[in-house]
Amino acid sequence: MVSPETSSSHYQSSPMAKYAGTRTRPVVCISDVVLFLGGAFMSLILVWSFFSFSSISPNLTVKNEESSNKCSSGIDMSQDPTDPVYYDDPDLTYTIEKPVKNWDEKRRRWLNLHPSFIPGAENRTVMVTGSQSAPCKNPIGDHLLLRFFKNKVDYCRIHGHDIFYSNALLHPKMNSYWAKLPAVKAAMIAHPEAEWIWWVDSDALFTDMDFTPPWRRYKEHNLVVHGWPGVIYNDRSWTALNAGVFLIRNCQWSMELIDTWTGMGPVSPEYAKWGQIQRSIFKDKLFPESDDQTALLYLLYKHREVYYPKIYLEGDFYFEGYWLEIVPGLSNVTERYLEMEREDATLRRRHAEKVSERYAAFREERFLKGERGGKGSKRRPFVTHFTGCQPCSGDHNKMYDGDTCWNGMIKAINFADNQVMRKYGFVHSDLGKTSPLQPVPFDYPDEPW
């Protein structure tokens, strides 16, 4: 991103008063003394009055219109110059049918006209998620999706991300797993201030509310997904990556990727053919239709020189992790983290939610430095993905017995919720029970229940 030119501001001051002249008489008369003392007394009264008003209670501070429209980070949300930008171009559309050209230049111009958004723009992120437009068939489906969404809202609030939730198709043909691409493109255009768009499936859950992605690692990349190069190029497996959670940079490269990616979806006249092509390469693909995940795999496999240099396949931690691998060990993870807190009083200290990242950084340095976040790690799993569970329809994979999916979801949701509600003084004492919560003792967990 090219930073705009900055101009320095100058404070100009002028004298408050000028000498009217100097006295020439060698002797000071009594009247002059009286006048001098009276003037000094009045000056003291004025100074006292000034400090009395300036030290008024902060609870009575008067807000002006300008300051009330600015957030604490200095972003001015009330300023939008009349200079023409891409929003004023009638040929630019948010839909997937028409490509967006010169997006980097368009976005740079918008930022230059809105300079208050430039500080912090390097990793500013908007999370995008969504679900179906109709009520769930599963009797508890809507409740589960609500709690999954609450989890994402909690994570975004803690880390300062914006979030956009879509529960409607933005293209009539792009449904199911393809619905994410129109939503992501629309979010890129709607949020030029954001460097990253973070797609998270409705059935994916943040189970480490402290962890943040290693942004520096992705500096030279435009797309981050959970995956493994060897499984793509050697095994040619359909499960070599998971497209249910990804970070995509808000840039022209990404716009073009979405156009190409979409070209293998239901809007393509060759949609049926693409499914056959994908299955001819990735032979463990379970169903004949072209899907977004295998389409991305196809691009990486067939056009490696074009896409692989800019796509980071994250395998060092659970960028999204298979729930059946994670949920059985959540109780052990809870105990490991409680042990850290028993060992160090800093982690037991009660604190405001707004400073949570400070305590997360302390835990990282004290206990987790150098610890990877995959299977068997001391870390909490970052994102737990309930693939195959279908919480809305209820038609989960037949390999999962009975209520395994729903019980696992409740346990993982409460595990994550404990990390949030602890800041509010309450926790789920039993991960299998959502309500009521228990108040946390003062020095918990060093002080017993």
UniProtKB/Swiss-Prot annotation:
Bilayer topology annotation: Single-pass type II membrane protein
Purpose of the protein: Probable glycosyltransferase that may be involved in the biosynthesis of xyloglucan.
Any single biological process term in GO: seed coat development
Name of the protein described by the UniProt record: Putative glycosyltransferase 7
Organism: Arabidopsis thaliana
Subcellular location: Golgi apparatus membrane
Highest taxon of the lineage: Eukaryota
TM regions (residue ranges): 33-53
Pfam family, one: Glyco_transf_34
Stretches in topological domain Lumenal: 54-449
Example of a GO cellular component annotation carried by this entry: Golgi membrane
Alphabetically ordered keywords of this record: Glycoprotein, Glycosyltransferase, Golgi apparatus, Membrane, Signal-anchor, Transferase, Transmembrane, Transmembrane helix
Keyword Lipoprotein: no
Keyword Transferase found: yes
Cytoplasmic domain ranges by topology: 1-32
Family, per entry: Belongs to the glycosyltransferase 34 family.
Documented EC number(s): 2.4.-.-
InterPro entries: Glyco_trans_34 (IPR008630), Nucleotide-diphossugar_trans (IPR029044)
Single GO term (MF): transcription cis-regulatory region binding
Sites where a glycan is attached: 59, 123, 332
Enzyme class, broadest EC rank: transferase
